[in-house]
Regions:
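Active-site beta->alpha loop and helix N-cap motifs at the rims of alpha/beta catalytic domains
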Residues: 1-37
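Conserved, mostly hydrophobic/aromatic
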Residues: 27, 74, 131, 141, ...
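Hydrophobic faces of well-ordered beta-strands that scaffold small-molecule active sites
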Residues: 6-10, 35-37, 59-63, 82-84, ...
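C-terminal helical cap(s) of enzyme catalytic domains, especially alpha/beta-barrels
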Residues: 145-170
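Catalytic cores of alpha/beta
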Residues: 66-76, 118, 122-138
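Catalytic beta/alpha-barrel core
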Residues: 31-44, 58-66, 72
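Glycine/Thr-rich beta-alpha phosphate-binding loop at enzyme active sites
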Residues: 72-110, 147-149
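Glycine-rich phosphate-binding active-site loops on the catalytic face of alpha/beta enzymes
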Residues: 32-36, 41-44, 84-93, 134-153
């Protein structure tokens, strides 16, 4: 029996507008395992954490390349997996990722055994391979959304081909 964890990524104001309890309980009811709120500062996670725990939905921690102390504090509390932000800024494709992510992963590994994966800007098989070699995986989002925008109803075939090329690189 195969189970693929599903994680929902949205902004905190969407959850607030809908109602945090209603939103997170609905996530649980439809089989969502985790919630990523990229605009939620770590210091404000307690707005959502008790509700996530109540409904067994992991509130996924994002860790940016900042100080070792901050990386350590955030990683000690992590649930589900850790989303390592490849570079500062917004999501989207990038031609290259130059951040020293090896040192970020090293600090995470010193503080937790929760898996970590790198995202923000991963769009090529080469980038996915490099990020997966540094961590437990690579997260691809914006590149898939662009394929869907381009092909609309015909996107499943193209998304499948793209994902296969990424998977083959790992």
């Amino acid at each position: 029996d195969l189970s693929i964890p599903m994680v929902f990524m949205t902004y905190a104001n969407v959850v607030f507008s809908y109602g945090a309890e209603k939103f997170i309980s609905t996530c649980h009811d439809i089989g969502i395992d985790g919630l990523i709120l990229p605009d939620l500062p770590y210091e404000e996670k307690d707005e959502f954490l008790p509700i996530c725990e109540k409904y067994d939905v992991d509130l996924i921690s994002l860790i940016a390349p900042t100080s070792d102390k901050r990386i350590g504090v955030i990683s000690k509390d992590a649930k589900g997996f850790i989303y390592i932000v490849s570079s500062l800024g917004v999501t989207g494709t990038r031609s290259e990722i130059t951040t020293d992510l090896g040192s970020v992963v090293s600090v995470i590994r010193q503080n937790t055994d929760v898996p970590c994966a790198v995202g923000f800007g991963i769009s090529t098989p080469e980038q996915a391979s490099k990020m997966a070699s540094l961590s437990d995986g690579a997260i691809v989002g914006s590149a898939i959304i662009k394929i869907i925008e381009k092909y609309g109803k015909d996107s499943p075939k193209h998304v499948g081909e793209y994902i296969k090329s990424m998977k083959d690189a790992l």
